[in-house]
C-alpha cells in the first residue's frame, strides 16, 4: 500500500521515494509486525481465555507438562493477523509472490484454525481427520505449484538448484515441479507443527529460517547479485523479503508471550501456516534443498515421528523414549528450557551453514 503511495506521490513529495527500497520496507515490516504482536498479544490472550480454548495435554507425556493444561491455544491467529496486515501495508501488492504467500499461509491457517476449534471447543481430541487434513494441504500445495508454473518467466524458475555447485540445476518439468512443491510445502507445514510442542520451540527457529530464506530471496530477485553468486535470477523474488521480515517480526512478538512459561500456545492455526509459508518461500526462490538444511530441526522432529511409528509397527519396539524428538530428550532428563535453547542453537548453526552455500559454490 505504501509503495503505491510512493509511486503516486513520489514525484511531488520526495520523502515518499524511500519506500521504493526493499530493504527499508523489510525493516519496517519486521518492526510493524513485532509491534502488532506485542500490542495485541495481551488482548488476544484474554479473549482466548474467556472463550476457554485451553490446550489439552497428553497423559502419556512428560509429567512436567500437566501444568500446561488449560493454557490458551490458537495464538497463531495473532501471528497470521500481524503478518497479513504488515504485508498489505509494506509489500508491493502488484507482486504475484506476495499474494501467493498470503493465500498459502491463510489457507493452511484456516485448516489449522478448524482443527484447533474442533479440539478445544467440540472436545474432539483428534481434530479433523488425517485424510481431510491431507486433502486440504494437498490442494493448496498443488495449487501453488500450478500457479508458479503458469506464471514462470524463466526456465530457472522451475529447476532444482543444488547448493555448493554453481552450474548444477535439473529441469523438473511441470509434473516434477508440482510433485516437489507438494512435498516441500506439505512436509514443512507438518514438520513445523510437530516441532511446536514446547514453549518457544517453534517460534524462534521459524524466525531464523525465515531470515535465512529472506537473504536468498533478496539475492534471487537482484540480477547482478544472483549472477555474481551463481543463483538463479527470479524476477520479483525480492518482494518475498518483505513477507519474510513480517514473519520474523510477528513470530518474535509472539515469542514474548510464548516463552517459558508460556501464556499462550501457537496451535495448529499458527504452526501449519508458518510451515507452509516457509516451504512456499523456498520453492519461489528455488532453495528447497537449502530449506532442508536450514530447517534441519523441523526435519529431525518429523523424522523422529516417522521412525518411531514405523519401528513400532514392524518390530513392536520404540527407537525413542517418546516422539517427537524434543520429548525424547525431556524424558532423558533435560529440562524443557534446556531442550528449547539447545534446539535454538542447533538451528542457528544450520542456518549459518545454509547461508554459507551463497558463497561456497
Curated annotation (Swiss-Prot):
The UniProt catalytic activity note for this protein reads: UDP-N-acetyl-alpha-D-muramoyl-L-alanyl-gamma-D-glutamyl-meso-2,6-diaminopimeloyl-D-alanyl-D-alanine + di-trans,octa-cis-undecaprenyl phosphate = di-trans,octa-cis-undecaprenyl diphospho-N-acetyl-alpha-D-muramoyl-L-alanyl-D-glutamyl-meso-2,6-diaminopimeloyl-D-alanyl-D-alanine + UMP
Q: Which cofactor does it need?
A: Mg(2+)
Q: Which Pfam families match?
A: Glycos_transf_4
TM segments? 25-45, 73-93, 97-117, 132-152, 167-187, 200-220, 240-260, 264-284, 289-309, 338-358
Q: Name one GO molecular function term.
A: phospho-N-acetylmuramoyl-pentapeptide-transferase activity
Key words of the record: Cell cycle, Cell division, Cell inner membrane, Cell membrane, Cell shape, Cell wall biogenesis/degradation, Magnesium, Membrane, Metal-binding, Peptidoglycan synthesis, Transferase, Transmembrane, Transmembrane helix
Q: What is its EC number?
A: 2.7.8.13
To which pathway does this protein belong?
A: Cell wall biogenesis; peptidoglycan biosynthesis
Q: What is its main location?
A: membrane
Write down the membrane topology: Multi-pass membrane protein
Q: What does this protein do?
A: Catalyzes the initial step of the lipid cycle reactions in the biosynthesis of the cell wall peptidoglycan: transfers peptidoglycan precursor phospho-MurNAc-pentapeptide from UDP-MurNAc-pentapeptide onto the lipid carrier undecaprenyl phosphate, yielding undecaprenyl-pyrophosphoryl-MurNAc-pentapeptide, known as lipid I.
The family line of this record is: Belongs to the glycosyltransferase 4 family. MraY subfamily.
Supply the PANTHER family for this chain.
Answer: PHOSPHO-N-ACETYLMURAMOYL-PENTAPEPTIDE-TRANSFERASE, PHOSPHO-N-ACETYLMURAMOYL-PENTAPEPTIDE-TRANSFERASE HOMOLOG
Q: What is this protein called?
A: Phospho-N-acetylmuramoyl-pentapeptide-transferase
State the species of origin: Chromobacterium violaceum (strain ATCC 12472 / DSM 30191 / JCM 1249 / CCUG 213 / NBRC 12614 / NCIMB 9131 / NCTC 9757 / MK)
Amino acid at each position: 500500500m505504501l509503495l503505491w503511495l510512493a509511486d503516486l506521490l513520489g514525484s511531488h513529495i520526495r520523502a515518499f521515494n524511500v519506500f521504493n527500497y526493499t530493504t527499508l520496507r523489510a525493516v519496517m515490516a519486521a518492526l510493524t509486525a513485532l509491534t502488532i504482536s506485542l500490542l495485541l498479544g495481551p488482548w488476544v490472550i484474554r479473549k482466548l481465555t474467556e472463550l476457554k480454548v485451553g490446550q489439552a495435554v497428553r497423559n502419556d507425556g512428560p509429567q512436567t507438562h500437566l501444568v500446561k493444561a488449560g493454557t490458551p491455544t490458537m495464538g497463531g491467529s495473532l501471528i497470521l493477523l500481524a503478518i497479513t496486515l504488515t504485508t498489505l501495508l509494506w509489500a508491493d501488492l502488484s507482486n504475484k509472490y506476495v499474494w501467493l504467500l498470503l493465500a498459502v499461509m491463510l489457507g493452511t491457517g484456516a485448516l489449522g484454525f478448524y482443527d484447533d476449534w474442533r479440539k478445544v471447543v467440540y472436545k474432539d481430541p483428534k481434530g479433523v481427520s488425517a485424510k481431510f487434513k491431507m486433502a486440504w494441504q494437498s490442494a493448496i500445495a498443488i495449487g501453488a505449484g500450478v500457479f508458479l508454473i503458469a506464471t514462470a518467466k524463466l526456465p530457472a524458475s522451475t529447476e532444482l538448484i543444488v547448493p555448493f555447485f554453481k552450474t548444477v540445476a535439473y529441469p523438473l518439468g511441470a509434473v516434477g515441479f508440482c510433485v516437489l512443491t507438494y512435498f516441500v510445502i506439505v512436509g514443512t507445514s507438518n514438520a513445523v507443527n510437530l516441532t511446536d510442542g514446547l514453549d518457544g520451540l517453534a517460534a524462534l527457529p521459524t524466525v531464523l529460517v525465515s531470515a535465512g530464506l529472506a537473504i536468498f530471496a533478496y539475492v534471487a530477485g537482484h540480477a547482478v547479485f544472483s549472477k555474481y553468486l551463481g543463483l538463479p535470477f527470479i524476477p520479483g523474488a525480492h518482494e518475498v523479503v518483505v513477507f519474510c521480515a513480517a514473519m520474523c517480526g510477528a513470530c518474535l512478538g509472539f515469542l514474548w508471550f510464548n516463552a517459558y512459561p508460556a501464556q499462550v500456545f501457537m496451535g495448529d492455526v499458527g504452526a501449519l501456516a508458518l510451515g507452509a509459508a516457509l516451504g512456499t518461500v523456498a520453492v519461489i526462490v528455488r532453495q528447497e534443498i537449502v530449506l532442508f538444511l536450514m530447517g534441519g530441526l523441523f526435519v529431525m522432529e518429523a523424522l523422529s515421528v516417522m521412525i518411531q511409528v514405523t519401528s513400532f509397527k514392524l518390530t513392536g519396539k520404540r527407537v525413542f523414549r517418546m516422539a517427537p524428538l524434543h520429548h525424547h530428550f525431556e524424558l532423558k532428563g533435560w529440562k524443557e528450557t534446556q531442550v528449547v535453547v539447545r534446539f535454538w542453537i542447533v538451528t542457528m548453526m544450520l542456518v549459518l551453514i545454509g547461508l554459507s552455500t551463497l558463497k561456497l559454490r
